[in-house]
Amino acid sequence: MKGCKLLDKDRFKWAAQEQTMPDEERRKHCRGFLTKGLERKSPIRPEFTAYGQGCLDMATGIFELLRQHNARLFAAAIPRKVARPVTFEAEEYLRKDQVFLLERYFYFLEQQKQHGLLVMDAVEKNEDRRFVRRLEAYFRKTQTGRYRSAWIVPAPLFVSSDMTYPIQAADLAIYCINWGFRLPKRGMDAPVRTEIAENYGRWLAQLQFRGEGNRDGGVFDSYGVVFVPDPYAARVSQKQREEAMLSKPPESST
């Protein structure tokens, strides 16, 4: 089950063809839709409608289950057209958005006083190994990474998404963020699909982590969804900014 299939534009179009069907009628027509797919026959209009409504109801049901079980949403978004530079740092280090994601996950675990696992969707073994290498370097070779390993178990688990329901739920949430969640004041202002924003945006807002973080000696509000305009740009701390300001020569006046 993929979010891109469950909530594609056709499903919304089919669901809106007729009034909402009673549960039993919808189930009957959904079975007809799936059976005709196996038989290579064309479904009739009520079957398309039932299948579309069933897909949307399933997505809503997943979000309801996540809320009932106190799930918390974490996501790091980057612009679609970002290209990875050909540099040693890009090859060997975690991207900035990945570090920010771990940061927020750490704040949540620290708040809950619980250890947390990293469960990944297995994609391609060579790329997965490269990611593990970057992750190990972060947790072993950086002071921040070693500190955060107090709550984050620094060894990820890889699973097949088609056999793991939580990964499928995460995929649905990611798809809804991609198309229906924006942070315009922070530069995350790409066009949305209105039907996703209106139907599932409130679920994302409810599930998003909210807590407190700390950096450079200060405490600030932290949220589970973060937008990173350039995931390969070097991060500059407040201390470094202050040192840079002090090192500048005074401006001469005329």
Please report, for each region that a protein language model flagged, where it lies by residue:
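Phosphate-ester processing/binding pockets and catalytic centers
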Residues: M1-T254
